[in-house]
Amino acid sequence: MTNRLLTFTHQSPIGHWSVSVWKTDPRLSEMVASMWFGEGKTAYQRDRILPSGQSQLLINLGPPQYRVEPGPPEVRVPFVDVWYSGLHQGPIDTEAPHGNALLGVAFSAHGTFPWLGERMDDLSDRIIALADALGDGALSLRERLLNTPALEARFECVERWLLARLKPRTIVHPAVRWAVDRIAATGGRIPVEDLATQTGFTRKHLGNLFQQQVGLSPKSLARIHRFRGALALLNSGDGQVPWAALAEQCGYYDQSHLINEFRRFTGFSPADLARRDRPDSQSVVLR
């Protein structure tokens, strides 16, 4: 096993699985936040993926998984090969009744634009079969991975594929890259007007660049980062949460604002969410 691969295992009443994280090629560091492979079986039926401020390339190397559209009527959409999940402003419910073997590439907020070269607001809040956007090349990548048993070699194969697809003429504007980094560094607490002033653009022009190259407005991305910051603090506590202090620390107007944002991004109040099983920082068990 190379020093680029780190594997974690989990076993508890909610299931058993392993997650391997790959240290990404430096040439991809501007666009890729992480690469990972998860495999195992859960004891629960359904989970909810929470907004993260990242988009995902997901390659299914195991049994079918399902995205659940709430309806009514409720619809289970199967995913069996390769798909792309854009930046989301709400939760996604999923099921993996037969276990999973999933390789993922998490893109930074501005990381997909140099790779797909499309308007990102056309892909936000959407999940698409990648073959619909890229043709059969996405499916041939999956076939190569299925025929490559070593995990390290699988990650290297995906890296080569990503590097080959980079579009030199599709470059993220430096102001967008800087603003995305500032939003992340401040936990979403920097005012959009300050971002515009410091980039030298009007708020409208910066917003248009964000819609094109990120897929969300600066304000929407900042809301996700504020939520993630509050969620991290909630996870690190001992169950006795001073809600008003948490709201102030994370940049919310008051406790009511915090609760409303949690309901928007998770479907639960903070207190309800804290009582639920959490397989990882990105999801919550529904049933």
Q: Where would I find each of the regions flagged by the language model?
A:
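Ser/Thr-centric signal marking residues that sit
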Residues: 266
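Alpha-helical bundle regulatory/interaction domains
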Residues: 1-203, 213-218, 232-253, 269-287
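Hydrophobic alpha-helical segments, especially transmembrane helices
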Residues: 204-205, 224
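DNA major-groove recognition helix of helix-turn-helix
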Residues: 210, 222, 261-263, 274
